[in-house]
């Protein structure tokens, strides 16, 4: 019988700018009576890194541009907030009432460039995504391996909407030490049919599973340890979450819209 387990780390302190996230993760694991083991996949909510990496900005420090003021009238959003989104974006894809859909500087297509204020202290303080989530994941993984002597993977996750589906789901936005995909193409199913398109984004599936414990409100569980997936995922040193992003030509939804 196959199985895996997920441990949501309780008692995690509020992260401050400059905090040593890997050291805190290892310490909280031990406080929970849990030792990190080889092949563990450590899923971390992006807000942890945003705080530690000083990616929290105050609206009072932001001066909106003409473009931000114009889009503010269209969206009904604070022009200073719109300016933050523009600074983090490559392209504005859609602007309408309460909606600002962009392609951000990391290549993610998302609402408000992933900027929000959930679990951020201060009414006008907002969290930006980590500057380079893959780099953050790699630094975290290497530090944890140095502290514990164990070979692990790290996934940084955030929550996004999906085309034509209600509700949001956790996705991987930064990865290190794990192959992003479980590729079934060329293999055969139970009846001998050759699989031609099955290439599962396993890091997104792991991120979604972890979100069941991380939650979105006051759960205060920003880190989940996933154990028992060594038969399902492959170790990979050089993976990047950019591999999950498809080109406009490949994007079926863009073609429909």
Give residue spans per PLM region.
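N-terminal and secondary-structure boundary signal
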Residues: 1-257
């Amino acid at each position: 019988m196959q199985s895996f387990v997920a441990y949501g780390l309780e008692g995690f302190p509020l992260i401050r700018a400059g905090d040593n996230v890997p050291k805190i993760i290892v310490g909280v694991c031990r406080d929970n009576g849990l030792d990190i083991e080889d092949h563990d996949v450590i899923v971390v909510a992006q807000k942890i890194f945003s705080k530690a990496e000083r990616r929290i900005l105050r609206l009072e420090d932001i001066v909106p541009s003409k473009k931000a003021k114009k889009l503010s009238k269209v969206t009904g959003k604070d022009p200073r907030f719109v300016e933050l989104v523009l600074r983090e974006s490559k392209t504005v894809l859609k602007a309408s009432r309460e909606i600002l859909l962009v392609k951000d500087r990391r290549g993610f297509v998302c609402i408000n460039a992933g900027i929000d204020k959930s679990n951020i202290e201060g009414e006008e303080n907002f969290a930006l995504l980590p500057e380079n989530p893959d780099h953050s994941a790699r630094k975290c993984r290497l530090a944890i391996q140095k502290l514990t002597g164990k070979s692990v993977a790290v996934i940084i996750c955030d929550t996004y909407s999906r085309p034509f589906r209600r509700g949001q789901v956790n996705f991987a936005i930064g990865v290190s030490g794990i192959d992003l995909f479980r590729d079934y193409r060329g293999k055969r199913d139970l009846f001998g049919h050759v699989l031609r398109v099955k290439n599962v984004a396993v890091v997104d599936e792991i991120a979604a599973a972890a979100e069941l414990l991380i939650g979105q409100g006051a759960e205060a569980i920003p880190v989940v340890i996933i154990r028992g997936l060594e038969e399902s995922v492959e170790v990979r040193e050089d993976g990047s979450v950019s591999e999950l992003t498809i080109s406009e030509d490949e994007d079926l939804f863009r073609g429909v819209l």
